[in-house]
Amino acid sequence: MPISFEIYRDGQRVTQFTPVNPVALGPESVPIPGEIVFENGHLSIVRTDEHALGIALLWDLGPQGCYHLETTRLQPRPTPYNLNVELARSRLMKIIQKQEDWNLFDFPRADQFAAMFRDAQNLFSDALGKLHEPVEAAALADRSLAIAVDLSEQLANFHGELLLNRRRASGSIPKHVFGCRVDSTVQNQRYKDTLAEHFDYAVLPMSWKQVQPEEETFVTDPVDEWIEHLTRKRIPIVAGPLIDFSDGGMPDWSFIWEHDFDTLRELAYEFVQKMVHRYRKAVSVWNVVSAMHTSYHFTLTYEQIIELTRLLVSQVKTLLPAAKTLVTITQPFGEYHARGHTSMPPMFYADMVAQAGVNFDAFGLEVAIGVPTSGSYARDLFQLSCMLDKFSTTGRPVFLTAVAVPDRNQPDSNDRSEGKLNPSDAGRWHRPWDPQLQAEWMEAIYRLALSKPFVESVAWADLADINPSIPGSGLLDDMLKPKPSFKKLQELREQFHRKR
């Protein structure tokens, strides 16, 4: 029996609907495989079992934004649920949970939020009383959800500022906080000087695909030049990821060994050994593996994923016992896991690695929001704060190694997708993306991230709009002129260094 929903918009039941990025959810909001279809006026989750499931999809809230929202888990039943009501129910439940987690129920200055919550709760109660009149119930639920999303963002910001002030007062914010990932193929001197003069450290990619495009060919000149420049300027370097299992991250020739784990393991081991030996005197932190949990093109078992992670991290530690090592999580919302391949949910992988005796020092974390790819649909600040909180139980610090949002609401022919990614298809944070909104989002997420005691640093994903990872995500434009986001980042850096 499927779990189905009726959808209401503008006072009418929707009879034609194309869900955007719909995902079935299991326990702990973990995405799981499941067919989601809209037919005969119902949005349905179809699976062979009859477990309780939730659904997440892009949902437009009008002036507040358009976010990837979720329902609670619901039991299969013959009659459909009201999707509007279930989305409101889920957000109100999460607010209660996080208020408890954040100890805000009895916090004196949190009283200002109680009235908003009562309003949202009362509207939701009214909606439950009108379930026999679904159009009216949906309208009440929509109003409740709008208040709840606004309230939850305010709560996330309020809690973040509380923790950030405590962290700054205690002097526990590290010295090297503000970094930026560079494109080593860019050898422009102004580009290099901007990085060296305006950031605490550099994230220097040196992936297997980039350095060894052919099995017997090593191309290290671009990386060598960057290493020399950064070393001369005394800029700390986070190198890697060395082995990147994300989509497009592995060398094309490596797919020959897709079903030969032993050979793949040996080749990866040799590559890591060469890179660490070559740059051992220059690199401060080694980002050893990334996206291992997504298993995009390699059908690895859970045991093989953990074994390869352990082997490669141990290799770095054997060569450089004092080196700091990262294991990087990408797509932290885990939507890739709904594909049904041999992937691992992000936090399951994080917990497994942390508990399996892998001798690594910290997690790396990549967060890209605002493009229509798996894991990058728009989320509000409350959702991002909740995601970060999950890492608090791993017992490891977190380095945000690549954070990005677009500065435009249309495709960018110069980005790595060559114009295939359109931010307008991925939702919006309050309003359509523009350069000023990019700067506002940056300030909000940096303050939120650095309020978490376990977050040690944050690096922006793209220095300039020269082959950026997503449309217009650079801090400089393609002529290397500063954008509002660059200026905002320098203001933040000055504030933190002055008051640290």
Model-derived segments and spans:
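Aromatic-lined carbohydrate-recognition surfaces of secreted/lumenal glycan-active proteins
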Residues: P174-V182, V288, T309-M344, R396-N409, ...
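Aromatic-rich peripheral "rim/lid" segments of glycoside hydrolase catalytic domains that contact
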Residues: R278, N287, M292-L311, Q315, ...
